[in-house]
Amino acid sequence: MTAYVDLMAHDRQTRALAQVAGRLSWDQETMMPRGASEQRSEEQGAMAAILHARRTDPRVGDWISAAQPEDAVAEAKLRTIKRDYERELKVPAELATALARLTSRSQGIWADARASDDVALFLPVLKEVVDLSRDYAEAVAGDNQTPYDALVENYELGITADELHEMFDHMRPGLVALRERALGASPAPEISGLFDADTQIALANDIAARVGYDTTRGRLDLAVHPFSSGSGDDVRITTRIAEDDPFNCIYSTIHETGHACYEQGIDPAYRMTALGSGVSMGVHESQSRIYENQLGRSRAYCGWLYGQMRDRFGDIGVADEDALYRAVNRVHRGYIRTEADEVQYNLH
């Protein structure tokens, strides 16, 4: 039992440090001065080195071998830690550090390139990220496993690229046909006007709280790309503002709130353990999409949203609740996944 207790204590501290690294990433995308990018890259590299050393500590292997879990929960924790330990052992420490530094540095470069609409600024560092990601994939790939399959395991354990292709190949024809039918229907109404940024943020905070987001254990901020970060009692979300398109803010907020509520809703007994975060990216995305689409684009919700938008913004360019319902469910082609409608999103 001592081995199991020692392993859990070590693992808990490691996960606490990983949360600190996550807060550094959150800060970089929300609050950090732009000039701090190079220093933040070094800080993230240092955190990655510490985390890699803890995750590959030889004592972890000894504790795993000697541990005697007493119930199914303990077995699940041990199984997850063992899998992660064996995977981390395959990654050279220098590679783990280099990846953390590079991906941190590339974030600011991407944001600058996006703001100036100049992809050439980002392409060199993107190539570096891809090259290092290939090195990582080759390092962790198991027997008869392709590098891409090895990377997919970071997000959806046990699935392969072939299985994904089979699933997408099955989905695509129906989605394309549905999109063409929708595009051939009568045009949906569109909102019009300019929508004050501060008023959008106030509405976004209200939306998040009303669907269950606990703001005593989280906060909403602005970022170039909306995301959710953290777990347990510190789960933060971001959104973005376009004054000519309030749906960008509204539906990004609902989507990220779905992620956040999933994390906030995990049993407190599992916090800071191997079972203390979302089970997979697929399950995580199901929660955000349920909030965004099944809730946020429903007829009942649009009735509430119409009143909120009229009260806060005045005339929004659509006549009534039904018109807003059609507007938020409008199907259209587009290249931006986070702004895609319910049909187009899955084609991305």
Segments (PLM) and residue ranges:
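Long, amphipathic alpha-helical stalk/connector segments used for oligomerization, subunit docking
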Residues: 297-348
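Contiguous, non-catalytic segments that form substrate-binding/exosite surfaces or channel walls
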Residues: 101-248
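Short, glycine/acidic-rich hinge or "gate" loops at secondary-structure transitions
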Residues: 122, 186-191, 270-275, 301-310
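Divalent-cation-assisted or electrostatically stabilized phosphate/pyrophosphate-binding catalytic cores
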Residues: 276-282
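Hydrophobic/aromatic-lined pockets within catalytic cores
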Residues: 156, 176, 180-183, 208-212, ...
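Short acidic (Asp/Glu) and glycine-rich catalytic loops that position anionic groups and cofactors
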Residues: 21-28, 81-85, 184, 233, ...
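A well-structured
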Residues: 1-157
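Active-site recognition of the HExxH zinc-binding catalytic motif
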Residues: 7, 141, 241, 245-268, ...
